[in-house]
Swiss-Prot record:
<dbReference type="GO" id="GO:0033644">
    <property type="term" value="C:host cell membrane"/>
</dbReference>
<protein>
    <recommendedName>
        <fullName>Uncharacterized protein ORF1</fullName>
    </recommendedName>
</protein>
<dbReference type="GO" id="GO:0016020">
    <property type="term" value="C:membrane"/>
</dbReference>
<keyword id="KW-1043">Host membrane</keyword>
<feature type="transmembrane region" description="Helical">
    <location>
        <begin position="688"/>
        <end position="708"/>
    </location>
</feature>
<keyword id="KW-0812">Transmembrane</keyword>
<dbReference type="InterPro" id="IPR022160">
    <property type="entry name" value="Phage_1-C74_Orf1"/>
</dbReference>
<keyword id="KW-0472">Membrane</keyword>
<comment type="similarity">
    <text>Belongs to the plectrovirus ORF1 family.</text>
</comment>
<keyword id="KW-1133">Transmembrane helix</keyword>
<dbReference type="Pfam" id="PF12461">
    <property type="entry name" value="DUF3688"/>
</dbReference>
Length: 715
């Protein structure tokens, strides 16, 4: 009998040894092996094959896969068979199309460049020099300042308005930056004051000699000899006027009418010529200002010296809870790329708006030795804090590939934007790609020591402190601001039929919702899900780029179908929380629309299972004190032969029971203590294993060990 049991046990183990790998391998097939229609990409020729590329770009199976420490999604090197270099063309295209907020071509427009090259003749042709000397060494700023000053003086309101709206330095301060020539010449009427107050300024005087009927103009620096001459010319009625130059440098002598002695510069004809030039050049000047403001070079002597393209990433943080003084900070990264699509330089800087707590600049440039880049970083805090009290500066060499991988592997989070007004007014086809949100918490915890090409431990610690200080941010932003997007108690009264609420998931992320949770207080409600595919950049006149969205996979759901209550008993009455199961879509969604079907109805939304909630609030009781939220529901087997269901239930038991395994989604979260993803846990656990071979192997071995121990007891 024992022998028969032993043979039976061996048979069962052998059978399971064959079946379990088959089941698991079937469950964990790569996405590109599923029956999906994907656009096949040819080999990039940059050290990555077609399969790796498809896995990298399309294996986005769940929201909290995006937080996995072993996930390729933000750092493709973790999933591909070969290490990617920072200058791989498709890698840059991937970052550009998924996360960048703009692309600038780092060459000025030909029209503006011709103004620079032909300025010597243009300033005479259009008589600009009669009003102002535009300096070529600071050509763009000086020309812009002249046009603005001229427009203000001669009441060209449309021109000054265009400059204020497009040139950053005029948005806050509308005063002219420069004076026109006529504003620098001051008419002197008190000649006695001139004698008593000697200065070293330039003057010009209009007078005529006793032997001549023609008026003449003379320029001089203040000295006593001219003071005495002026007195004699006044007595002889041969004096027209005296002017003092209050500008910088030596001025040009104005032109006069020799018969009348009147100054002919700045007359109506000359004004009209300048106005013609402004009408001709304003658009090009404004576009050039925009290009330079976005990181383009203003070196017009060597327009080909720098990279041909700059990829811009604007990472934004906003504290909207402080209504009286909204604080906004924009962290901007710029990667300068040459014609061979190689990164040759870049920078990372902080610009504060209504917030001067911290500022920094981190720039780097290629040395010519592969991935080795020289860097220079500086940081300054205007507030007294424990972490940073003074100006710091550090320079050296680092590995750019490792820096970019570390940065993008930690920096990006999905952005959920309230697009209700756009959707309500039928603008869903015109969604704009807005500023990217950066995860400063993860960046602050990132260890940047390994990217520094130096062995001195003190230098490494200083470098790490420098970068971590750059990514310093208040926890208030994460605990409060993000919750305002998905407030658990957000009541909305519908004032008209088909009232809609919509959001867009940004930062290149897709959501894979399985359940939608909602209140039972409303009467009728529908939801819609879209998959909005962002087109690649298309460029307007080489000065900027915009995105368009193509919508597909739109799903309409009656909220009452396939729904039920999350909790029973007292909790059902307490929360009134219902769920609706949603059909699984492998390609994911990034647009969600909530639509009420009854006038004056009230609805309350609890979002999808990808909720962004305060982790501590959920874990400390918060919405669901009984902690049943995290329990995975068991699968009902079709019969004793349903080994798949038995295997799944065994895994569910492990997840719900064994300490540590229960927190598996925390292991899959790079943000850990900041966000918890509320999920249909069972549906996602196999997805987590697929991207974490170590975790998959561990739990599988535990499961096999349990089965083995059962059979040992039988034997």
């Amino acid at each position: 009998m024992k022998k028969s049991l032993s043979l039976f046990a061996i048979f069962i183990l052998t059978f399971l040894g064959l079946v379990i790998p088959f089941i698991t391998l079937t469950a964990f097939r790569p996405l590109n092996e599923e029956q999906y229609t994907l656009k096949q990409e040819s080999s990039t020729g940059k050290g990555i094959n077609e399969t790796d590329f498809i896995n990298t770009m399309f294996l986005r199976s769940s929201f909290f896969e995006n937080w996995s420490e072993t996930n390729y999604f933000i750092n493709p090197t973790l999933k591909t068979s070969k290490n990617l270099l920072f200058n791989d063309k498709w890698y840059l295209d991937f970052l550009q199309d998924s996360y960048s907020t703009g692309v600038v071509y780092d060459k000025p427009g030909e029209i503006f460049l011709n103004y620079y090259r032909q300025w010597h003749s243009l300033k005479n042709k259009y008589m600009v020099e009669k009003f102002y000397d535009v300096k070529k060494e600071n050509f763009l700023n000086d020309l812009t300042d002249f046009i603005y000053a001229f427009a203000v003086k001669y009441k060209m309101f449309d021109v000054s308005k265009e400059i204020v709206e497009n040139v950053d330095r005029y948005k806050e301060n509308h005063y002219p930056r420069v004076k026109l020539k006529q504003d620098n010449w001051k008419l002197i009427t008190d000649y006695n004051w001139l004698k008593d107050n000697f200065d070293n300024k330039y003057y010009f005087v209009i007078w005529k000699q006793s032997y001549s009927k023609e008026w003449e103009i003379m320029k001089f620096k203040h000295n006593m000899r001219y003071d005495m001459k002026i007195e004699s010319y006044i007595k002889n009625n041969s004096f027209k006027g005296l002017y003092r130059w209050d500008g910088d440098g030596e001025p040009q002598t104005p032109t006069i009418d020799k018969n009348t002695g009147e100054i002919t510069d700045w007359n109506s004809y000359q004004q009209s010529r300048v106005k013609q030039f402004i009408d001709l050049s304003l658009y090009s000047v404004l576009q050039e200002n925009i290009r330079v403001q976005q990181g383009g070079s203003a070196d017009y002597e060597n327009p080909n010296k720098v990279g041909t393209k700059r990829i811009i990433f604007d990472f934004e943080t906003v504290d909207e809870l402080d209504v009286k003084n909204i604080k906004k900070a924009i962290y901007r990264m710029i990667l300068t790329v040459d014609e061979a699509n190689l990164i040759i330089s870049g920078s990372l800087e902080l610009n504060n708006i209504n917030n001067d707590d911290l500022s920094f600049n981190f720039s780097f440039m290629r040395t010519g030795m592969g991935e080795v880049f020289n860097f220079n970083g500086s940081i300054y805090s205007s507030l007294n804090s424990k972490d940073l009290k003074y100006y710091q500066q550090f320079s050296g060499q680092f590995d750019l590939s490792k820096f970019l991988q570390s940065f993008f592997a930690s920096a990006l989070v999905p952005v959920f934007q309230n697009r209700s007004l756009f959707i309500e007014n039928g603008y869903i086809d015109n969604l704009q790609y807005d500023t990217v949100l950066v995860n400063f918490f993860a960046l602050k915890l990132q260890n940047f020591n390994n990217i520094l090409l130096i062995e001195n431990i003190n230098d490494k610690l200083q470098f790490d402190k420098l970068l971590n200080s750059m990514f310093k941010i208040s926890q208030k932003f994460y605990t409060n601001y993000l919750r305002t997007i998905f407030d658990l108690e957000n009541n909305t009264y519908v004032q008209g039929y088909n009232k809609k609420y919509g959001l867009l998931v940004n930062n290149g992320f897709k959501i894979y919702p399985r359940y939608f949770y909602f209140s039972d207080k409303y009467k009728q409600l529908d939801i819609k899900l879209y998959s909005a595919f962002k087109n690649r950049f298309y460029t307007i006149n080489n000065y900027g780029s915009v995105f368009n969205y193509d919508f597909s996979v739109a799903n309409n759901y009656n909220i009452k179908l396939n729904s039920g209550y999350v909790f029973g008993g007292d909790l059902q009455n307490k929360y009134g929380l219902q769920y609706k199961k949603i059909e699984e879509q492998k390609i994911g969604y990034n647009v969600f629309e909530l639509q009420a079907q009854k006038e004056n109805d009230m609805y309350r939304y609890y979002d999808f299972n990808f909720g962004i909630y305060n982790w501590q609030e959920i874990n400390n009781g918060g919405l669901f004190p009984d902690k049943q939220w995290w329990q995975v529901q068991y699968v009902t087997p079709k019969g004793w032969w349903d080994f798949g269901a038995h295997i799944k239930n065994a895994v569910i038991w492990i997840v719900n029971t064994i300490p540590g395994v229960k927190q598996v989604n925390e292991l899959a979260s790079g943000v850990g203590k900041v966000f918890e993803t509320v999920y249909s846990f069972f549906s996602q656990i196999f997805e987590v294993w697929k991207f974490n071979p170590a975790l998959y192997s561990t739990i599988t071995n535990i499961f096999l060990l349990i089965i083995f121990m059962k059979f040992v007891r039988l034997i």
